[in-house]
Amino acid sequence: MDYKETLNLPSTEFSMRANLVKKEPEMLKKWKEMDDYNLVLKSREGKPKFVLHDGPPYANGNIHIGTATNKILKDIVIRYKTMRGYYAPYVPGWDTHGLPIEHRVSVEMGEKIKEMSPVEIRQKCKDFALNFVNIQREQFKRLGVRGDWDNPYLTLDPKYETHILNIFKTLVKNGNVYRGNKPVYWCPTCKTALAEAEVEYHDHSSPSIYVKFKLIGEENTYVVIWTTTPWTLPANVAIAVHPEYDYVKIKVDGEYWIVAEGLLNKFAAETEINYEVVEKFKGKDLEYKKAKHPFIDRESLIVLADYVTLEDGTGCVHTAPGHGAEDYLTGLKYNLPVLSPVNEEGIFTEEAGKYAGLKIWDANKVIIEDLEKLGALIKTQKIEHSYPHCWRCKNPIIFRATPQWFISVDKNNLREKVLEEIKKVEWHPKWGENRITAMVKERPDWTISRQRVWGTPIPAIKCKHCGEVFIDEKVIDSFITIVEKEGTDAWFKLPEKEIIPEDVKCPKCGHNEFEKTYDTLDVWIDSGCSFEAVIRSKGEKFPVDLYLEGDDQHRGWFQSSIFMSVAHTGQAPYKSVVTHGFIKDEHGRKMSKSLGNVIDPKEIVDKYGADILRLWVSSIDFFDNIRVGKNIIQQQVEVYKKIRNTLRFLLGNLSNFTKNDLVEFDKLLPLDKWALGRLQEVISQVTEHYEKYEFSKVYSLINRYCTVELSATYLDILKDRLYVEAKDSIYRRSAQTVMFYILDALIKMLAPVLVFTTEEAYQLSPLKEFDTVHLEYWPQVRKEFVDEKLMEEFKILFMVRDDVLKALENARKNDIIGHSLDAKVTLNGVNEQINNVLVKYKDYLEEIFIVSQVEIGEGKVKGEFANVSVEKASGEKCQRCWKYSEETGKDEEYPNTCPRCAAVLKGLRK
């Protein structure tokens, strides 16, 4: 007789092959038809709110691995919180103004852009941005990210723009906005000012020169400066020294040079000079002395500055207030002129004399040659150093003094208020607080004006009579009213008389004829106002629960948001901030096209499915820098297969099981009680990790639970009972009851991550109660399922099991047995406690060890917890269950079966 037909073999439509690439789009279609986002929200109406506010990515290209990771992390949080019973909306947004988009449009339009009006350029930018909003929206949806995709927030939306202008008005009203001729980061390529957050640092090769400035009033005496920007020397008006440092006058070939004593050895080594120290004095003794500029007919004042260091150079710092932030502040203190003879394209103006018309980078060489001819050059060489570059065009930038609009970060104690609010926020990881605190403490005033057309216009006007440029609250109010109906294009379209109220007067001369100015706001103002435009104005919970972005946003969106919010509302816009690191390749290198190590999320999704990408995101300790590559993704494919196979085994063995078949805890078999108790521990630990946003710990725990504790242990042990015992016997139903609870918990714990796979499993499972798994609630820890004494006893049993498995493996190597069911095990515990446990559970040891026979007796091989002997099992092999028994073959009706199998087949074993 073929006994295979009498076994309870697994049966499920949940295939071993995932085929996610085909199935996922089908599920997305189904979710769209059921309007899953609103369906889920409706199911949580009246529940406590959890609001994660989405930081807007730029709508200027396809999503990349960084934006994909960010959105998936947010989606995991939202889905988890929803399952915990929160009303957790998710409104995605896009940053749609600014230089990144205008730069792309400029490149696409080429020379044509010079003939286009501002309104035409803005329309092209708008079209460009909206196109990529649509592209990115579909790409994010394909990742399984659930949100209000039909109603995102866009910074170009007129309603949004009115909120920007209202907050700007608050800043104006509070006196935080001012106009100044200060040096700012300037991109000569993009021809605009940049804020700190728009600056990147890359390696750059620069000339390094030592230059002599002749000291006036002292014969043959020179102050030596060092600079890596020779092109700024035409703007030099001072030399800064540290008041408390020691300086020396050294004799070199009949001349006297002044340098800091702390840098003398380094300076002498680099310049290869022989010298003699003739005098020593403090830096403060040099204050107000004057030196002669080496190639321009003017004097350079010696001034004091605490920022002078002894790291490089000579301790005598070339100072040009028009080309440096610290230089500018020193210039204010000493009433120095602010010279910046460079135009918007980085070309010298007439003010630079003989260098007029030269590009600043080309001028370096000419200036060095002139210094050499004049005998002022001591040494020149090339150095590689970290230098600021434009975030958009990636070209080197400069400091350039131009009239700009600024936000004073100290007016009305704004900086101090922000620092106080930072302390109230919960930062993950904790070092995030120190990082943003240091940045806020050190940050200069905020340059908010941009010389571009694609942005929110700064409603500043210029008096036609005296040239005064100013901002009037009445003009802002008038413009806001217009923007509500027409958008900010109106600033570029409408004549002044339709925007500027008649009663506006010039604060300087009293006249009332004006023209508009056309600077636009820094885009960090735009996105920094999202707390008002998206949250407060719509009556959402404020402050929100969470901001979650890359750690570069400590100087970006986190900072712009808290400054705007504190200025407007007096408090931080967020309760908690979670940051993730930068994404690098699997070797820790930055991704770049030239290295060929760029990982495209679309390629992963198209090849493996979005759930594989999501599983990878859950696997990373994202608080640190993140690594990804083809090998790492392939590892996730293997992990996914193990998780999927665990789900498949559970589903296959629950195919005929319903909730009516559940066995009460007290009636469960001991092994099943242990497994159910262990499940409660897993649920508790997984929940704790989710709460702390430690998704990599969730991943590791569930991965180990599925592969080691379930597939390789508990489920492996259960196969005999599941397949061999009677379909509805207590032996099988006890196992199925626990498998039911495990499947329920596993699907729910994995649902925030494997959104597609868990949906597929849920639809085929006996635990389905809702139309989608994503309407389900989080599994609860049930203490009534934990028998503490039994859990401790099984801890001992599994330690003994490890010793038994080692002994079985040795027996297999020595050809004593083939399969473990060929074995008889004799064992005893190494102490009385272990032995008592073995005796107590002796009737279950065959099952736990997956052997045919177990005897409590003297084992020959010493183990850590038990002494174990393995020999060939006695009797004959049952053709149905493959276990050996001396009673096998004695049943006439079912020959070749053991007594247990014969009883099952006769319906006698229930």
UniProtKB/Swiss-Prot annotation:
Binding site for L-isoleucyl-5'-AMP: 549
Motif ('KMSKS' region): 590-594
Cofactor info, note text: Binds 1 zinc ion per subunit.
One example of a Gene Ontology biological process annotation: isoleucyl-tRNA aminoacylation
Key words, A-Z: Aminoacyl-tRNA synthetase, ATP-binding, Cytoplasm, Ligase, Metal-binding, Nucleotide-binding, Protein biosynthesis, Zinc
Molecular function terms, GO-annotated: aminoacyl-tRNA deacylase activity; ATP binding; isoleucine-tRNA ligase activity; tRNA binding; zinc ion binding
Record note on quaternary structure: Monomer.
Catalysis: reaction(s): tRNA(Ile) + L-isoleucine + ATP = L-isoleucyl-tRNA(Ile) + AMP + diphosphate
GO CC aspect terms: cytosol
HAMAP family, A to Z: Ile_tRNA_synth_type1 (MF_02002)
Cofactor requirements of the protein: Zn(2+)
Positions of short motif 'HIGH' region: 57-67
Record remark on domains: IleRS has two distinct active sites: one for aminoacylation and one for editing. The misactivated valine is translocated from the active site to the editing site, which sterically excludes the correctly activated isoleucine. The single editing site contains two valyl binding pockets, one specific for each substrate (Val-AMP or Val-tRNA(Ile)).
Protein name (Swiss-Prot/TrEMBL): Isoleucine--tRNA ligase
Record-linked NCBIfam families: ileS
Gene that this sequence comes from: ileS
Residues annotated for Zn(2+) binding in this entry: 878, 881, 898, 901
Residues reported in the UniProt entry to bind ATP: 593
